[in-house]
Curated annotation (Swiss-Prot):
Assigned EC number: 3.6.1.-
Chain positions of site Important for substrate specificity: 12, 70, 154
Cofactors named for this entry: a divalent metal cation
Keyword Lyase carried by entry: no
Reaction(s) the record says it catalyses: N(7)-methyl-GTP + H2O = N(7)-methyl-GMP + diphosphate + H(+)
Enzyme class: hydrolase
Record keywords: Cytoplasm, Hydrolase, Nucleotide metabolism
SUPFAM superfamilies listed in its UniProt record: ITPase-like (SSF52972)
GO terms classed as biological process: nucleotide metabolic process
Highest taxon in the source lineage: Bacteria
Family: Belongs to the Maf family. YceF subfamily.
Organism of provenance: Pseudomonas fluorescens (strain Pf0-1)
Name used for this protein in its record: 7-methyl-GTP pyrophosphatase
Active-site residues, as the UniProt record annotates them: 69 (proton acceptor)
Amino acid sequence: MLPLLLASSSTYRRELLSRLRLPFVCSSPDIDESHRPDESAIELVKRLAEQKARALADSHPAHLIIGSDQVAVLGERIIGKPHTFENAREQLMAASGASVTFLTGLALLNSQTGHCQVDCVPFTVHMRVLDQARVERYLRAEQPYDCAGSFKAEGLGVSLFQSTEGPDATSLIGLPLIRLIDMLLAEGVQIP
C-alpha cells in the first residue's frame, strides 16, 4: 500500500481519519481558496479538495493523498468560518429554524499514477428555532469560530439541531469516511 497523506492541518479531519486505523501523515497545502465567479458551491469544494491533494504531489511522489474542503450553504448563500463572535451570532441567527447544507469535497490522488478520484458529499442540518440568548450562550461555551456554519457538530453544537439527514454523518465534521473508504478500496487499500 502506498503511504497515506492527509492534506490538512485540521485536528477534526485527523481524528476522523484515525478511525480507519491506517497509518498516515499530515501536511498542510498552500493554495488559493477563493471562490471563482459563477462557480457553484459543489464545484468549489470539489476543486479545492483536488487542489489541496495535487499541491502536495510533487513533494510526496508515491502517496495516496487525501484532500478535503467544506462549505455550508444557507439558502443560496455560502457561509464559511465566522472567525468572530459577531459573525458567528449572525450566522446562527440566520440559520434559526432553517436548513443548512454542508458540502464536503473529497479527493484521493494517487501521486504515483496521477489518478484522482473526486466527489462531493452533502449533509443537511435542520436547525432548531434559536433565540439570541441561546446562541450567545452556545458561542461563549464552545467558541466555534473556525467551523463553517458556526457550530461544532461533534460537541455542544448538536444541541442546536432539530434533525439531520445525509449519507455520511462524518462529512459534517469535514471528512466523509464512507466515501473515502470507497476510494481507498478502489486503490487496493484493505480496510480493515
